[in-house]
A protein has these predicted regions:
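C-terminal motif of bacterial Sec signal peptides marking the signal peptidase cleavage site
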Residues: 17-20
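Bacterial signal peptide processing site
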Residues: 22-24
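Von Willebrand factor
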Residues: 30-93, 96-142, 144-146, 188-189
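Short beta-strand-loop
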Residues: 76-110, 198-201
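Exposed acidic/Ser/Thr-rich ligand/metal-binding surfaces
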Residues: 119-172
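VWA/integrin I-like adhesion module and closely mimicked acidic/polar interface patches used
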Residues: 152-203
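P/S/T/G-enriched low-complexity
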Residues: 191-251
């Protein structure tokens, strides 16, 4: 009996070992991180209200996987900048948005990130985001950084050097955090978008810009009287225009 018990114990241990090493079920959500930065500077005042409403929809759509949007396993939302350059601001985690309606998310965003004449500091934002990702052990998970901003750095430009301020935007802390890192800039002018694409130095980080004129089109995709989970045009518009998969470094 003892040998049989020993064999049975060995088989059970092996089974437990195989169970512990088995991959996650196919229905589980793959790890991926969404970081959003909201511009509260005076230069963004014109687009602030529209941007807050879109950000609330964007978060709601992703958190609920509407229209096939990727569901993030980690979310951090903060402001881009502060009262002075280099000021570190708090990020709100995914728990602050889960279970809320679009209206509730928008109200929270307005409360946490009121429109103020603050300094826009992209480099500090990227650095803080990278620190959070490392602390939360999210390295290697696909990283999506969405900047809801006009993209104007608060750095004076030398005469004739239009790209100078953009060359000072440091995305270095985001490099090598993941095999797939994309920075998406929403609401810039076409000129600012080109300056980001040409002036911001990067290696593995991919950059995607959506002009303010294009962003204005999201409202046209909504069908009155149709619930959000059936707003297929809206979610497809977001997938095609905002979440566009950048396969290579642009410019």
């Amino acid at each position: 009996m003892r040998p049989r018990r020993a064999v049975a114990a060995a088989v059970l241990a092996a089974a437990l070992g195989l169970t512990g090493c088995a991959p996650a079920e196919s229905g589980s959500t793959p790890r991926n991180t969404l970081v959003m930065g909201i511009d509260v500077s005076g230069s963004f005042r014109r687009h602030y209200d529209d941007a807050i409403e879109f950000t609330a929809l964007y978060l709601y759509g992703h958190l609920n996987g509407l229209g096939g949007l990727r569901v993030p396993t980690a979310v951090f939302v903060g402001s881009v900048g502060g009262e002075q350059a280099g000021e570190v601001k708090s990020f709100h985690p995914i728990h602050d948005f889960q279970g809320k309606s679009v209206e509730q998310i928008a109200a929270s965003l307005r409360e946490w990130f009121p429109m103020q004449d603050q300094v826009t500091d992209f480099s500090t934002f990227f650095d803080r985001a990278a620190t959070l990702i490392k602390r939360q052990n999210l390295v290697l998970a696909p990283l999506n950084v969405v900047l809801v901003s006009d993209g104007l750095p608060d750095v004076p430009a030398a005469p004739g050097d239009s790209l100078g301020p953009y060359a000072q935007v440091q995305v270095g802390p985001l490099e090598y955090l993941s095999r797939s890192t994309t920075v998406r800039l929403l609401y810039p002018t076409p000129t600012v978008a080109v300056r980001w694409e040409r002036g911001v130095e990067r290696n593995r980080v991919r950059l995607w810009t959506v002009d303010a004129q294009v962003m204005a089109g999201w409202r046209e995709q909504m069908v009155p009287g149709v619930p959000l989970n059936a707003q297929e045009r809206l979610w497809k518009w977001i997938a095609d225009n905002v979440d566009f998969r950048v396969r290579a470094r642009v410019l």
